[in-house]
Amino acid sequence: MNEEGGYLGAMTYQCLYSPVMEKIKQQHRDDPRASLALNKLHTALTTCEQASPSFLYDFTKVLLDDSELSVNLQESYLRMHDTSPTNDLIVSGYEQNADYKELTKRAIELRRVLSRVPEEMSDRHAFLETIKLIASSIKKLLEAINAVYRIVPLTAQPAVEKRKREFVHYSKRFSNTLKTYFKDQNANQVSVSANQLVFQTTMIVRTINEKLRRG
C-alpha cells in the first residue's frame, strides 16, 4: 500500500460509498427486497474496509481507470468532506459528555473548513480568510483533545498523546505547505496535506473510541 492509499483508503467508505449507499437506501426504502440487498452490500463493503482499508480505494481507482475518467482524487476527496457523514467523529456512548461533544464539534468544524480549500484557492482574499479559520479550528481542536486527555482512562492517555503529537506534526506540515504554495502554486500538494490532516483528525477520535471500548 502506498502512502496515498493509506490515508485516502481509510477514508474511502466514509467519504464516498457511505453517502451513496444512504441515498440509494432512501430511494428504495419501501422495497423490502431492495433494502435487504442493500443491507447485504453495506455489510460486504464495511467488511472489506475493515479487512483491508485500501481495498475500496484501489477498487475506485480501477473503476476510474476503466472508465477513462480524469479525476483528481486528492481534490475530490477534500471537497467531499464537506458533506460526508460525521458519525466517525462521534465518541460512541459518550455523546452527552461535554468534553467528548466538544471534541466531536471541533473535529467536524476542522474537516468542513478544510473541505473549502480547493474551492477558494483561486481567490487569494477568500483563501487567506479560510486559512485563518483553519488555524483557529486547529487551535480549538487541540484544546478539546487536551480536555479529553484529562478524562480518558490512564491506560488510554499514551495513545491519545501519541495521536495528538501526530496531529500537531501534520498541522505544521500543512502550514509549511501553504507557505510553499504561495511561491510555487502547487495546489495538489495543498490538497494532499489537507487530506492528511483530515485523516489525523479522524484517527484521534477512532483511537479514543477504541481505548474506551477496551476500558
Swiss-Prot record:
Domain of life per record: Eukaryota
Free-text tissue specificity from the UniProt record: Expressed in pharynx, intestine, germline, vulva and excretory canals.
MF (Gene Ontology): protein kinase binding
Keywords assigned: Cell membrane, Cytoplasm, Membrane
Membrane topology: Peripheral membrane protein
Deletion consequences: Animals are sterile and develop slowly. Excretory canals are approximately 45% shorter and are characterized by a discontinuous and wider lumen, the presence of cysts and an increased number of canalicular vesicles which are swollen. These defects start during the L3 larval stage and become more severe when reaching adulthood. In addition, cdc-42 expression levels and activity are reduced along the excretory canal length. Animals have also a reduced distribution of Golgi and ER components along the excretory canals.
One Pfam family of this chain: PDCD10_N
A cellular component term, taken from the record's GO annotations: cytoplasm
One of the GO biological process terms: positive regulation of GTPase activity
PANTHER family (alphabetical): PROGRAMMED CELL DEATH PROTEIN 10, TF-1 CELL APOPTOSIS RELATED PROTEIN-15
Function: Involved in excretory canal elongation during postembryonic development. Plays a role in promoting Golgi stability, ER integrity and vesicle transport probably by regulating the activation of Rho GTPase cdc-42. Involved in fertility.
Complexes and interactors: Interacts with gck-1.
The family this protein is said to belong to: Belongs to the PDCD10 family.
Protein name as annotated: Programmed cell death protein 10 homolog
Gene behind the chain: ccm-3
